[in-house]
Amino acid sequence: MALLEICCYSMECALTAQQNGADRVELCAAPKEGGLTPSLGVLKSVRQRVTIPVHPIIRPRGGDFCYSDGEFAAILEDVRTVRELGFPGLVTGVLDVDGNVDMSRMEKIMAAAGPLAVTFHRAFDMCANPLNTLNNLAELGIARVLTSGQKSDALQGLSKIMELIAHRDAPIIMAGAGVRAENLHHFLDAGVLEVHSSAGAWQASPMRYRNQGLSMSSDAHADEYSRYVVDGAAVAEMKGIIERHQAK
């Protein structure tokens, strides 16, 4: 049966995902940045309360995946922290200036991660040569690759995803970006074994007093009185679709 991973941005969201049938959680911060490394406090609270596998993302900033020496040092320290806290896996990825896997840095990450299952995230979708990259990731011992098939969403990239799955000795290929209940059957029918979804929605802040003339964001138009949460009903719906597909 296909595995359902839910992207979560808080301990509460991880619990919601677990309670509604998620098989695994990718734990992140900063949804508007596409997911950054969670704080130590969030990591500890999730480790204490969530029982399904949780893989934190290790990503120090938004933007591209070519990091300064200081950023890479922080990545290695965060990898060690996640390992020490007892998480079963993590999610990360580093590219060089030419859009190739930075093999030297990834080897250091893999050494720091030790027995943890490492997912190479959607840095893969920004790489220059996906098949060469897949070979490099297999050589590194990467457990899985999260990808949209190098398109803006995974449905558009499904043909590339299937090409990657068929590639000899490839890591597990997990489809992600825009995967929802309404299009999930396309991935299941194609034989995708792992899917990744935010299954989320923006929820209004409970704040009654709102200073509308002031923003804490560099984006003056950002809505600071909403937060991104996992929709438990959406998770349950996706899990049900997977179970019914398996029963066919």
UniProtKB/Swiss-Prot annotation:
It is found in: Cytoplasm. One of its GO terms (cellular component) is cytoplasm. Keywords: Cytoplasm. One of its GO terms (molecular function) is copper ion binding. InterPro entries: CutC-like (IPR005627), CutC-like_dom_sf (IPR036822). Pfam families: CutC. The keyword Hydrolase does not apply. Its main location: cytoplasm. Gene3D superfamilies: Copper homeostasis (CutC) domain. Homodimer. Belongs to the CutC family. HAMAP family: CutC. This is PF03932 family protein CutC. It comes from Escherichia coli O157:H7. The gene is cutC.
